[in-house]
Amino acid sequence: MAILGMGTDIVEIARVQAIIARSGDKLAHRILTPLELSEYQQHQQPVRFIAKRFAAKEAAAKALGTGFRNGLELRHFQVIHDELGKPHLLVSDKANEMAVRLSVKSWHLSISDERHYAIALVIVEG
């Protein structure tokens, strides 16, 4: 397989905290899938949860080479974890259409955070 695209994104956690303080759960409802929203509502560190999901989804859109345009939305990407905690991306709707068009066979996702930032890297292969 060949690398078809790569995307990375970094999010300042304090910025996400400020958005949530101003608008409550509006950000969560805008970017999270129903499954992610359920996880967010039960998470011990909800601000970090959203920051990492946002970074992952932005990185995924960049890896497709499009960013968020032509109908692609943050909720078209979903982050899940396997039994060891490794993150994986699921794609739907426009994200899936674009992945099929590009002949994407696999997605690789890495997410990390520290005191002030969350970062994600996505590599797509086909």
Curated annotation (Swiss-Prot):
It is found in: Cytoplasm. GO terms for molecular function: holo-[acyl-carrier-protein] synthase activity; magnesium ion binding. Keywords: Cytoplasm, Fatty acid biosynthesis, Fatty acid metabolism, Lipid biosynthesis, Lipid metabolism, Magnesium, Metal-binding, Transferase. Disulfide bonds: none annotated. Its cofactor is Mg(2+). Its main location: cytoplasm. One of its GO terms (biological process) is fatty acid biosynthetic process. Pfam families: ACPS (PF01648). One of its GO terms (cellular component) is cytoplasm. It catalyses: apo-[ACP] + CoA = holo-[ACP] + adenosine 3',5'-bisphosphate + H(+). HAMAP family: AcpS. Belongs to the P-Pant transferase superfamily. AcpS family. This is Holo-[acyl-carrier-protein] synthase. It comes from Hamiltonella defensa subsp. Acyrthosiphon pisum (strain 5AT). The lineage of its organism: Bacteria, Pseudomonadati, Pseudomonadota, Gammaproteobacteria, Enterobacterales.
